Curated annotation (Swiss-Prot):
Pfam families: HD, HD_assoc. InterPro entries: dGTPase, dGTPase-like, dNTPase_2, HD/PDEase_dom, HD_domain, PHydrolase_assoc_dom. Residues 62-198 form the HD domain. One of its GO terms (biological process) is dGTP catabolic process. This is Deoxyguanosinetriphosphate triphosphohydrolase-like protein. One of its GO terms (molecular function) is dGTPase activity.
Amino acid sequence: MTAPYACQPEESRGRRWPERMSTFRSPWQRDRDRIIHSSAFRRLKHKTQVFVEHEGDYYRTRLTHTIEVAQVARTIAGALGLNTDLAETVALAHDLGHPPFGHTGEDALAALMAPYGGFDHNAQALRIVTRLERHYADFDGLNLTWESLEGIAKHNGPVTGDLPYALAEVNAEWDLELHTNASAEAQVAAVADDVAYNHHDLHDGLRAGLFTEADLAELPVVGEALARVDALHPGLEPMRRRHEALRRVFGVMVEDVIAVAQNRLASLQPQNVQEIRDMEGPIIRFSKPLYQNLKAIKLFLFQRMYRAPSVVVERRRVTEMLNGLFPLFLDDPSKMPRTWFQAAEAAGDETGRARVVLDYVAGMTDRFAIQEAQRLLG
């Protein structure tokens, strides 16, 4: 049984295009299934976080990251009496809008799109699930429920100021109440993203040799976990020691989020989901001490992993690829596949063409972007 402040399936605001209710699945189970079966979700397999795909099969991809986020989201949501299906749905959708080459790709496309309304991966995820997926006879997109769209749009909290055009377009058609907090389920998905990032970037950085366990021993939380493992399992082989310590770090983060939320919910006693949306600030978050410790870990990762010389070289290389492909397609849309060429021709002006090119390039996998750059740029 879910808590009164959880999103209730029977109270869903529904879909943009009304559909008959399923006999066997809740609205958010259907949303989840549509996301899993989408083309954009499958492409996440060949989109990377930090390391370009061809560098190794071990490193996380957007797909493995997304699965990890969904697992964490279900765990936290279940512990708090929230709707686990909605939390999982938002988690599964949260990275659909990421372009090839991780954050490097996003930075490159944001710069290229600056004259044409900008680029934001959360807004692009909304565009994918409302426009670009074309599997159904009666509508474009996946026709997700309002609650799922809200969770995607507010992944980083309430949205104020100038809106990315993709988000403004959707919000103009269906008010997502961008000025309010997201549901508790969507907040859980956002925090689960942070948990998964912090955990697996430590794993991947160690695997890549960008830092050592001795380096991690100097960090808050991680150092304590390593010391605890050494006390309980002296002489443990290095691989097991590493995994055991990072497993404990993972547990610390999840348990902290649950404890903080339980205390805040007990104190504030919200009676429905709207009270969650109208609160001052999020109800799902890390404690202040852990938040500060995680900032130190993120700074370490930024300096030793994201700005590692080998990663910086790769960032430059893939940025050059996108800086070559985007203007090439913008100047000559016929170099894109026929359907994309036709869409660009029908767009009317340069801004419209640029947005079509963005949709095409942002949808590429790392592998395909590299192949296209080799084919078209030499």
